[in-house]
Structures are given as C-alpha cells and as structure tokens.
C-alpha cells in the first residue's frame, strides 16, 4: 500500500492514519529540549503487549502522541502522571538526618507504618517517607510538629538526672500525677526511671511531684521554715488585742451628744405622717428594731467624733462574786469556785464594749463622711432603715414594704438628678447602709447611754419617748 499511488494519498485523514503506526528506529541519545515538560496525560503509562522490544533484540523507545499538546512523549513522561503517583511510598536507604530549620506543621498521616513495611527482606533498615498533606514535602513518620503536640502527653521513660537549679524557683504547675502509675516505676532491666509530664501551665516537662503547689506542707508534721517577721494582725483578729475592753475617753461630752442625737432621731420618726397612722404597738416594733441604726445615721450627720481608752478588766473572782451577790441579794457568803482561764465569758456577756466593736462604729462614720451625704439623702436613708418589712412581729407588712420601696425610688431619682457622673451614687449610699449590719445595738447602749441611764432598759426608754411629747 505504501508503494502504490493511492487516490487518498496526501490527504489529512491518510496522514493521521499513517502517523499512528510505530515505525521508529533504535533510540538515539535524547536531545536537549528547551521547552518545559508538557502537562499532558498518562495515556502511555503502560506499554502495549509485545511492544517492549523488536525481534532482533534491539531496544526501542515507545513514543505516544499526547492528547493535550499534540507532541510525542515517552511513556510515563507527563507531569500529571508524576503528580498522581507521587503519593506512593518510596523505600530508600536511611541517611543521616539533615538540619531542618522549620519543621512543617503537617499531619501525622505516616505516624504508623503499614503492615509488612517495617523492613526489607534482607534485614536492612528503611526510612518511611510520606508526602505531607499540608506543605507538600516528604517527612519521615512522626516528624511533624502537630503529631508531636498530640503525643506530648505520653509518659516518656528516661534515666533520672540531677535536677538543675532554676533561677525562679519551681513552676506553679499542677501535680496531676502525684501518684506513680502502676507498673511504671522501673524498667524491666532494673534501671531506675523518672516520669516526666507536660506541664499544662508553662508547656515544659517536669518530674512528678515537682510542682510548688504539691511541695507545700500538707500537715503540721512537716518541717517549717525559719520564722520571719509577720505583718500585724487586722483589728478584727482576736490575737491582735481586738477583744480588749475599751471606754470613752470623754464620756460626759460624748454621752450628752449621743443623747441629743437620740432625741432628734425619735422626733424625726414620731412626726412622720406615714408613721403616725400606725398603731402604737407597731410603732414600738419598728423603733425597737432600728433605733441603733437610726442613731448611727444621726451621729454621722452631726459628725460626732470620739476617742476610747483601754480599761482594766476586773478579775475572774470579782466577776463571780458580783454575779452571785446580784442573784442572792448579797445576804449569804459565797464560796470561791475555781474556774479555768479559758472559760472566761466573751465581751458581749460582760457588757463591756471591745476595741473591734468600737472600730466597726468608726468605720461606718468614716464611710458616711467620705460620701458627703446631704440632708435629704440622710432623710431618705433613715426612711429606708425605718420601714423594714423583715422585722419580726410586724403585722402590716405590705404597707411597710410599700413605704420602703417608695423611699428607695425617691432616693434613686434624687441621686440621678443631683449626681451625674460615672459612679452610681445610689449604690454607694446603700453600700454604707450595709455596714450597719456589723454594729450591735447593745454595744451602742453600753458605750453611749449606760453611764447616764444606768440599769434602765433601752426598750423602756423607746416606749416612754414614743408616748410622751418630745
């Protein structure tokens, strides 16, 4: 057919059919191509049957027409085919690891080798390389930072070494592994091991029971450090002398000022229209409950200042004799019993104000003075204290609750109009009322009124002042 003149010879269809025939000679030395490799297909990745060589033993190179660029390429010569087959694992002889400046934050896709891939049949060690799905480079198995972070919680057994001196002391980490896990105290060969754990605070490995929190003494039997100079105890601490009895330095002047303040307080309460409509028994219930708090607000408004001095406490024998004489009328001689020093009654039972109780009064006065409370604000605060629905024995609870709520609303509107600033004036005023909970009414009576009224009860005084015209 080739030696004959065909009518279709020279046509495009004839040339395409003839170009598919493989009529190539023995391969010659490949020439240098200036153009880049084609991103072609892998249409010639497998040679045809019987096409690997000629009958004469001459080696041939099978060329295929690329369906992308139209040129002839040897089999498996396209970049696309190389990319598709690059994910296969390649076995190579392990070499010395090179210094890596920045390991890839890749995945652990090659963390575990496949079955039967741990070594070659000849016993030669192999290094498994995997194409990282993050950076596209080949890494040995377990060589990514992400895999190291995920497996950093595993316990590593290393030989114990002498601990190095840390300049900043032990880290304040947690001793999650204070007890050694079973079966991990030593290796099978009898070598001692040290369990290291990744600290959840600083990210470093510390030996077990090496944290500062764990090393703190947990019992009184542990050795204590050298005693240092401790700061002075606060005023509410009993060891600082806060329970020592005190008295007014100028009782005559202070007691007269306190009595005048009590009269003004009762006059303010008695002539309130909303208070006058209440029955006398309900008025007495309210006044007996809050007279001390109302007096403290009045003393803060009058800016009463006082000083106290420490008094000598009577001996235990004198207290016992005085108590027995009051009970028996002082007619019978009393034996002297023996009491232990730790059985002494507290300061409230002795009816002698202590230093801590007086300090609570001074703290409230200082708080009110620091706020610069006006006359109207003092009046609203007194109304809030007076109309308390939680008083035991109160019958008209809803009426008192409405009065307290109305007083708070008026105070809130007043502070909003007079104080326009970043701080909430209403909250600051109510915080001052919170300090009244730490003041005892019996302490106020003993400190300011006992030198004047003697043994008269304060409840009787409240009843007399409500019934008489002030």
From Swiss-Prot:
Motif (LXXLL motif 2): 80-84
UniProt subunit comment: Homodimer. Interacts with NR5A1, NR5A2, NR0B2 and with COPS2. Interacts with ESRRB; represses ESRRB activity at the GATA6 promoter.
GO biological process, one term: negative regulation of intracellular steroid hormone receptor signaling pathway
Stored Pfam families: Hormone_recep, NR_Repeat
Protein task: Nuclear receptor that lacks a DNA-binding domain and acts as a corepressor that inhibits the transcriptional activity of other nuclear receptors through heterodimeric interactions. Component of a cascade required for the development of the hypothalamic-pituitary-adrenal-gonadal axis. May also have a role in the development of the embryo and in the maintenance of embryonic stem cell pluripotency.
GO cellular component, one term: ribosome
Signal peptide: none
Ranges occupied by Sequence repeats: 1-67, 68-133, 134-200, 201-253
One Gene Ontology term of the molecular function aspect: transcription corepressor activity
UniProt superkingdom: Eukaryota
Identification of the protein by name: Nuclear receptor subfamily 0 group B member 1
Domain NR LBD: 215-469
Species in which this protein is naturally found: Pongo pygmaeus
